Amino acid sequence: MKELSSAQIRQMWLDFWKSKGHCVEPSANLVPVNDPTLLWINSGVATLKKYFDGSVIPENPRITNAQKSIRTNDIENVGKTARHHTMFEMLGNFSIGDYFRDEAIEWGFELLTSPDWFDFPKDKLYMTYYPDDKDSYNRWIACGVEPSHLVPIEDNFWEIGAGPSGPDTEIFFDRGEDFDPENIGLRLLAEDIENDRYIEIWNIVLSQFNADPAVPRSEYKELPNKNIDTGAGLERLAAVMQGAKTNFETDLFMPIIREVEKLSGKTYDPDGDNMSFKVIADHIRALSFAIGDGALPGNEGRGYVLRRLLRRAVMHGRRLGINETFLYKLVPTVGQIMESYYPEVLEKRDFIEKIVKREEETFARTIDAGSGHLDSLLAQLKAEGKDTLEGKDIFKLYDTYGFPVELTEELAEDAGYKIDHEGFKSAMKEQQDRARAAVVKGGSMGMQNETLAGIVEESRFEYDTYSLESSLSVIIADNERTEAVSEGQALLVFAQTPFYAEMGGQVADTGRIKNDKGDTVAEVVDVQKAPNGQPLHTVNVLASLSVGTNYTLEINKERRLAVEKNHTATHLLHAALHNVIGEHATQAGSLNEEEFLRFDFTHFEAVSNEELRHIEQEVNEQIWNALTITTTETDVETAKEMGAMALFGEKYGKVVRVVQIGNYSVELCGGTHLNNSSEIGLFKIVKEEGIGSGTRRIIAVTGRQAFEAYRNQEDALKEIAATVKAPQLKDAAAKVQALSDSLRDLQKENAELKEKAAAAAAGDVFKDVQEAKGVRFIASQVDVADAGALRTFADNWKQKDYSDVLVLVAAIGEKVNVLVASKTKDVHAGNMIKELAPIVAGRGGGKPDMAMAGGSDASKIAELLAAVAEIV
């Protein structure tokens, strides 16, 4: 077996499959493009779903890739085991309706065992297979695999909901008896026992059925096009080929671990407690790649995942004695390890470091809050005479504050308290069940549509015309091909068409189809791409249509021009965002409609009003500069040399269109555009908002809609000016400001009067001092307008030695507000209010010196006040 670096393994994999006629698919962005069913790209096949479900036919049915992936359903196990990771690389080879079982197994065996390639010893390889899949068993035997090395497994059948499914055969490497201390042997495989001896290095899925949850597996229909989908983990291959005990001792992780050693002053012990090193090394890889691909830490979705990873890594850094921000210092090391295939981490190093450091600094403040929360929980246990920290509270510390369970356990036990492990496990399981349910909900690839996949007739979209005559090639009605149709709805394919099929954020054209007499025979309501790329016209049929007949196709020209204004403006907006807020503000989604444009982009905070003003100004300057718009067809590499902005994650064919707007914007784009930027007329941003963690959205209008937006604003301003009696529009702001200042002065005067009234009332309240258990206290109901007045009472009380404890209750509307203040260490205000609040059907909490609560039962106020003497 060859000893190769991870980069050599990856390259040898790709080279082998290229030698078998496969095209190399570049690794896609970790953030899925146009796939709402996935939070992350989580496998090599995830980006190829459109090929497997038949919605798109690839140019080459043989594909290979090395795909960066993220899976986060098992974060808590990362660092504990030898092979769990959040971010990993999946090497794959795929056949879309081309070769099948025989070639997949034979070539796979060749790659693994040939001296020209990986050169694995054959006697170290074991294969599992689905018991009913005798063909795979026989093919392995034909390759020279001993029958004793083939293990039938009932679970070797791959399916996720409806869609492509089939048996799979897995390949394992035997690391020997040293990794099997109990000498269990092949039963480890047969019974699926977790072990370190037999390492799964490759899975070959034989996708031959359309799974249907409504019928038994034996009744699944065969796919019209059988597929091969395989996955081999680079980290596992590297561990085996580099003789590493775990994935973490490979060249993918050890350089990071060495840097952590320098930062911590601790030494990584492969046989000792090294969990924190592993967690940090794993999580910083995931963070670096995900942030580089446009995901940002936040409170929801993938942003929450990143925040959780970062916080877990920081806490493990603290366990190693690293108490300052440090994760951002590891980003260059991650970039250097992966540079040969993923140069983007080093290219975006400054931005990634900035985001990681900023998030670390924020978490440092959160840790203080979490520590305070734990202190409060422990104080509450002490007050209640309990000795166990509940699982739900441990989970909240873990989930909300990022506290590892081990840290909570350590601090709680140091304080003399036990841990409710079962309660924590229950809360954790509930969260995992919710997460897994969400994944399964949209995880299937969808059923193949044989009718659409069978369309092979050529069809060409003509960019530069709004009307043309063309022959009708295909009619599909009720999901069946037919020669003619006279009513209802149908799908049509023409030899050529002026109708743009929806793609790249640009909506489809609408229009009409006419016969040779000039009569409209169909209305085009939508156009989408067929699996083989032909524009597929959805039409409402008004009169007879037949295959082979020529028709005149006319698009709605006015609508197309309105869409083009918005599409061209989108390119200008994208460039302006780069110039004003930074290169990281890349497209995360777009929609170019007739009435407006919508542009989503990656950014870590709201765009300020001043920045929006600059962006709007810059776009309009380019419109007024009357820039010529040109399109060029070329290959991707030439386009990039021209400076074209490729949208990371998008797939481009051999020939791409480059849209250039003067010297201001150059992008790869297959959409339609104006001839000159001046045709846009006017550009106006109408809204900027956040739509998810690290993603912002701008909605803008152009041309007539932009003019109307400005006019509507002017009308609103005129109305305001009239209301405040401003002589001219320019005076309206000053008038509004004067009214605001006057209102503020009146509110201040009113507050001062309230304070004086409260002080006068306080004089009476503070005279009623009682004593119990050696503690002086005041317990009184007061008549105030809001809860803030209670705090004013407390502030006045603190100024003099009226009593040790103050308890105030006020009925405000339908609510009861309670305040407890304490000057003595013998009475904890927060604990006391937790006993008082339930009396008025409320709850609350606070600090030792001040606490507040809210309730709903005003009839029990007297009972609450009477209880103070007992509780104090």
UniProtKB/Swiss-Prot annotation:
Reaction(s) this enzyme catalyzes, per UniProt: tRNA(Ala) + L-alanine + ATP = L-alanyl-tRNA(Ala) + AMP + diphosphate
Subcellular location: Cytoplasm
Family stated for the protein in its record: Belongs to the class-II aminoacyl-tRNA synthetase family.
PROSITE patterns assigned: AA_TRNA_LIGASE_II_ALA
GO MF annotations, alphabetized: alanine-tRNA ligase activity; aminoacyl-tRNA deacylase activity; ATP binding; catalytic activity, acting on a protein; transferase activity; tRNA binding; zinc ion binding
Name of the protein this chain belongs to: Alanine--tRNA ligase
Keywords of this entry: Aminoacyl-tRNA synthetase, ATP-binding, Cytoplasm, Ligase, Metal-binding, Nucleotide-binding, Protein biosynthesis, RNA-binding, tRNA-binding, Zinc
Enzyme Commission number(s): 6.1.1.7
Superkingdom classification of source: Bacteria
Role played: Catalyzes the attachment of alanine to tRNA(Ala) in a two-step reaction: alanine is first activated by ATP to form Ala-AMP and then transferred to the acceptor end of tRNA(Ala). Also edits incorrectly charged Ser-tRNA(Ala) and Gly-tRNA(Ala) via its editing domain.
NCBIfam families: alaS
Catalytic EC class: ligase
One CC-aspect GO term: cytosol
Keyword tRNA-binding: yes
Binding site for Zn(2+): H567, H571, C669, H673
Cofactors that this protein relies on: Zn(2+)
Cofactor binding note from Swiss-Prot or TrEMBL: Binds 1 zinc ion per subunit.
Record-level GO BP terms: alanyl-tRNA aminoacylation
SMART domains for this protein: tRNA_SAD (SM00863)
Chief location: cytoplasm
Domain notes: Consists of three domains; the N-terminal catalytic domain, the editing domain and the C-terminal C-Ala domain. The editing domain removes incorrectly charged amino acids, while the C-Ala domain, along with tRNA(Ala), serves as a bridge to cooperatively bring together the editing and aminoacylation centers thus stimulating deacylation of misacylated tRNAs.
